[in-house]
Amino acid sequence: MDNEETLGMAFGTLVGEFMRTKEVPELDAYRFAAMASATGVDGTSADLSTAAATIAAIDAATVAMDDNEVPYEGRILFVSPTIYGLIKGGVTRMVMNGDKNVNYNVNMYNDMRVITVPQARFNSAITLYDGTSNFGYAVPAGSYKINFMVVHPSAVLPVVKHEIPRIFSPAVNQDADAWKFQLRLYHDMFVLKNKVKGIYCHKKSTANV
């Protein structure tokens, strides 16, 4: 294996790690903020600290969606790690696998797939940096942490128009005598006005500072 092949493998690892630690968190944060801030989205604000209150709040969200005739099949329940822990404490179940290990994970709740979202990505608004001095995003004061969100996929349209990773050799890189990695991504998240009731957002009652 020559140096270029070895370098190619290294850049492959770099791209995967960059997407996992930089691209995906920013995409998640942007999309959840776009859904939470869309006009007409149902929801409420409250601090959930018990399993009973959490289960009741999620059940109230499903009732609101039922009243708005949102399709029952296909709903997804996105939750913060804290809320996921409360759900696990409020649901009675025990699954034994072939190794006799006990699994208390909750993958489905009332036919909704449960997906845990790190709290840093789960806010009602974010500020994107322009890349000139800082990269990524920040959570602005006045926004709210999201406890959970119920989403029907028909209510949203995530779009990735252009995504391309590029590698520049030292002979091409004009910034330094070094290899350079660049990722260009053009994307957006659209909430359909006639399907907006397919989103329910439950936020904390105290704003971020």
Name each model-derived stretch:
Residues 1-42, 47, 66-81, 166, ...:
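Long, contiguous amphipathic alpha-helices that act as assembly "spine/axial" helices in icosahedral shell
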Residues 6, 49, 90-209:
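Sequence/fold signature of self-assembling virion shell proteins
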